[in-house]
Amino acid sequence: MKKLLVVLLPTLLAGCSYYDAMVERMNTDTLEYRCDEKPLTVSLNKQREQVSFVLDDKMLHLNQGRAASGTRYTDGIYAFWSKGDEATVYHRDNIVLNHCQLQNPKR
């Protein structure tokens, strides 16, 4: 019985890991923006209410916050604000990426 458990337990744990990764991918959209001729790839995790993207060789993970209009994500230093097919990225309230237009939006 112990030998069977030793063999099956890693398989069961691997299956759980695979399931978690699959659910994570299902809840994540990849959004491609063009910001003043610069590309910006944003991963939107709907379950975590979080966006992730690379800016200046740094991976940023921003959590959804309050917004009067549109959707805003922030970590207290950086902010990603989007409304419709447009977005803006801020660093300490200064615009660092502007005129970001969503490419090939889903309708």
Curated annotation (Swiss-Prot):
Entries under Gene3D superfamilies matching the protein: 2.40.128.200
PROSITE patterns registered for this protein in UniProt: PROKAR_LIPOPROTEIN
SUPFAM superfamilies in alphabetical order: YdhA-like
Quaternary structure and partners: Monomer.
Protein name: Membrane-bound lysozyme inhibitor of C-type lysozyme
Lipid moiety-binding region (S-diacylglycerol cysteine): 16
Topology class, membrane: Lipid-anchor
Entry's localization field: Cell outer membrane
Keyword Lipoprotein: yes
Disulfide bonds: 35-100
InterPro entries tied to this protein: MliC (IPR018660), MliC_sf (IPR036328)
Organism phylogeny: Bacteria, Pseudomonadati, Pseudomonadota, Gammaproteobacteria, Enterobacterales
Family: Belongs to the MliC family. Type 1 subfamily.
